[in-house]
Amino acid sequence: MEFLIDFCPYVIAALVLFALGFNLSRRENKMRQATHAAVSLPWYSWEAIASILLIALFSALRYYTGNDYRMYLTNFQQLQADGSLLRGNLEIGFVLVTKLIALTGCHFSVYFGFWGALQAFCLYYGLRHHKQLYCWIGLVLLLGPFCINWLTYLRQWTIAIAFVPMVPYFARRKFWPCLLFTLVAVTIHYSAWILMLLYFVPLVLKADRSRNFYLAIFAVCYLLGTYPVWLSPIASSRWLFSLVGYDKYQCLFQPLIEEHFVFKGYGPLRLIYLFQSLLFIWYYPAMREYYSRDKLFNAFFTLAFVGVCYQHLFINTVYALIRPADYLFIFVVIMMAYVFDYFMAIKKKFMLCVSCLVICSFTFISCYKEVYFLCKPAAECNLLYHFIPQL
């Protein structure tokens, strides 16, 4: 019973976000039918504002939910107690924001709520021209494969979501806005400089590429990741990890240097990762035609495709090697929202129900596995949602 109670906030928040997004999309469609024009409701409609506030509240009220929560909480509380930081190597921008909130005497819920509000604002603003996705975003983000990443990697996922409204600038190769964003992002998480590499990646793909082309690339990455012996020389290059800001994880790569790899079994979680990757790749050609007027669809697909290829290429290594892909996982969430919207539009109800059920079972299975297979008490499981004991 305790397990279900602690899991319910995920479901309730996801369903409310779905209802708000669905209502906004429905109102916009009615307005277009009435005016016979491609008019849009403002992105700051009450449903979007309510969604942002709900995500902020969801972030604010959590307590020891997410693997890194303890570190951020302890830093904040110690800063309020004696003005020092438990972890001294945090980035200057992140430290500045933390100090501004901590030294005003605010409760730590305000601190976590601020980051949740910032993330939600960037996500909804970045998708302001794609409001039909709003209803699906909440479901996939809270119940899908990357919810735990979002709740755990606070700094990295803040930058990842802030990158969403910047995609048009990267797609059009606007150098100065891209550079300015990267410089600001680096002050929140050092590894964000990796995003500048995307400036040189053609995000708008050729329209004549077939489904088999993308499946072949994904298959190669998947097979190479099955037994990554080719990684041993890379893992021994200390300068490489220092360059990308992961030098503190160097000790974790010793098993790779000695060719002791981590072979992950094909349980339900691994299969869901594989299913979602194949799903949006398989339907990409059809969706490309359906969303032909969507100027950012191809860019979103490219970023999601690179993300899942990278993930499966390194999935049998230490997780620190997969961490750079966290900047791209938000686009997998967006692509799954596109897939669900596409299924609804062409009335593929069976595929919509099956795929939505599979994808949105990930958080539940993760929590269930932690409690019932790893025998952790529900109160100690940092994947379940725990409310702060008192305000």
Regions found by a protein language model. Name each.
Residues 151-157:
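Short acidic/glycine- and proline-prone juxtamembrane loop motifs at membrane-interface regions
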Residues 146, 177-201, 312:
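Membrane-interface alpha helices of multi-pass inner-membrane proteins
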Residues 65, 70-73, 199-201, 206-324, ...:
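Alpha-helical transmembrane segments and terminal signal-anchor/GPI-anchor hydrophobic tails
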Residues 70-106:
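Short hydrophobic/aromatic helix or loop-helix immediately within or flanking a transmembrane segment
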Residues 124-143:
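Transmembrane-helix signature of polytopic, membrane-embedded enzymes
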Residues 92, 104-121:
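Loop-to-helix entry region of an early transmembrane alpha helix in multi-pass inner-membrane enzymes
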Residues 218-219, 344-366:
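Signature aromatic-anchored transmembrane alpha helix within multi-pass, membrane-resident enzymes
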Residues 163-177:
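Membrane-interface transmembrane helices that cradle and orient dolichyl/undecaprenyl
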